[in-house]
């Protein structure tokens, strides 16, 4: 599974490791992706998201309901 935040769409970046001699070696910069469950009081259920630390701060600021509308997650049929 790819390391992409479901809220901010952050993903890995490619860059260089640099030695003291300034030799370049390719490397990856990975986002801080975590699984987190959020309670949705209107639907009386939990939702599990794979989000970055920045995505968690966005949810704290805006609220889970607004973020769910922005990313387009709908109710489960069941």
UniProtKB/Swiss-Prot annotation:
Ribosomal protein: is it a keyword of this entry? yes
Report one GO cellular component: cytosolic large ribosomal subunit
Q: Name one Pfam family in it.
A: Ribosomal_L28
The record's listing under SUPFAM superfamilies reads: L28p-like
Keyword annotations of the record: Ribonucleoprotein, Ribosomal protein
User: Which is an annotated GO molecular function term of this record?
Assistant: structural constituent of ribosome
For whether the record's keyword set contains Ribonucleoprotein, the answer is: yes
Give the source's domain of life in one word.
Bacteria
InterPro entries from the entry? Ribosomal_bL28, Ribosomal_bL28/bL31-like_sf, Ribosomal_bL28_bact-type, Ribosomal_bL28_sf
Instruction: Please give the biological process terms from Gene Ontology that the record holds.
Output: translation
The protein's matches in NCBIfam families, at most eight in alphabetical order, are given as: L28 (TIGR00009)
Q: Which family does it belong to?
A: Belongs to the bacterial ribosomal protein bL28 family.
Protein name as catalogued:
Large ribosomal subunit protein bL28
Gene this protein is translated from: rpmB
